[in-house]
């Protein structure tokens, strides 16, 4: 179910969103490390899952994968925990508590006749209200959480093999390997914005991403404009042709096939 224009507008403004009776908040920079831990539970390419799981609502598929792995005596992958952790971040459930305590806030409810089928997850909000989210509801909430926090999801019709090929091509053309440390991005944006790093920690993650992309575009445009004036040419065209708009990427290269999300975490 696609999100509405009003929700998209709220996401761009870094506002909270009401959905399914719940309030979803933009995740803040101060929780970036936890966000990155939970991210594979949201941005996985579901089409890359085995067919039996690919056709299920994502949360139900995660539960079924974990159940089947335990039945075989194998190590579980952890995607269900990642998805629930992302939900906790978005709801600000258990904020400030250790990760294991935040995850313990959720209770999985299953079909009484088929214990491998997840029917809902339950949790207590504000210390008193019992809430229930079904896998179908999570499908919709996932779209909002992604939009609020700068995650680009793969469309259902996407070819997972093509997505993986595009990602690998982007990595090959990406030049030097970067550290990817979150604090480095925060420190750089703080310097460019003439702000304290502690101030930026209170920003929504999407705001940090937007500011970083904007500064990258400004500096890239200035550098390439000077280079073009000196006769420089690029095989695939100027990478920064506009001061105001990003160059359109060929395909979504930010998506995670299941093999990447589960690498080093056992097999499902």
Describe each region flagged by the PLM:
Residues 1-78, 83-85, 132-229:
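An amphipathic, hydrophobic-aromatic interaction surface with interspersed Lys/Arg
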């Amino acid at each position: 179910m696609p999100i509405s224009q009003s929700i998209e507008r709220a996401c761009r403004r870094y506002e909270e969103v009401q959905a399914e009776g719940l309030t979803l908040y933009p995740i803040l920079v101060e929780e970036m490390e936890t966000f990155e831990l939970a991210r594979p539970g949201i941005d996985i390419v579901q089409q890359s899952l085995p067919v039996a799981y690919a056709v299920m609502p994502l949360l139900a598929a995660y539960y079924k994968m974990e159940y089947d792995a335990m039945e075989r005596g194998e190590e579980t992958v952890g995607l269900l925990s990642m998805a629930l952790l992302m939900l906790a971040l978005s709801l600000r459930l258990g904020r400030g508590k250790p990760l294991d305590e935040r995850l313990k806030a959720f209770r999985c409810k299953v079909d009484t006749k088929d214990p491998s089928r997840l029917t809902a997850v339950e949790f207590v909000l504000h210390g008193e209200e019992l809430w229930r989210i079904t896998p179908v509801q999570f499908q919709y909430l996932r779209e909002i959480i992604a939009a609020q926090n700068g995650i680009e999801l793969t469309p259902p019709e996407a070819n997972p093999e093509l997505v993986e090929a595009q990602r690998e091509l982007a990595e090959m053309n990406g030049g030097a390997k970067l550290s990817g440390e979150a604090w480095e991005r925060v420190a750089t944006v703080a310097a460019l914005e003439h702000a304290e790093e502690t101030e930026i920690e209170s920003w929504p993650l999407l705001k940090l991403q937007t500011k970083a992309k904007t500064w990258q575009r400004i500096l890239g445009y200035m550098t390439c404009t000077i280079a073009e004036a000196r006769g420089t040419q690029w095989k695939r065209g100027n990478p920064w042709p506009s001061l105001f708009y990003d160059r359109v990427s060929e395909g979504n290269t930010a998506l995670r096939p299941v093999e990447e999300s589960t690498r080093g975490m056992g097999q499902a």
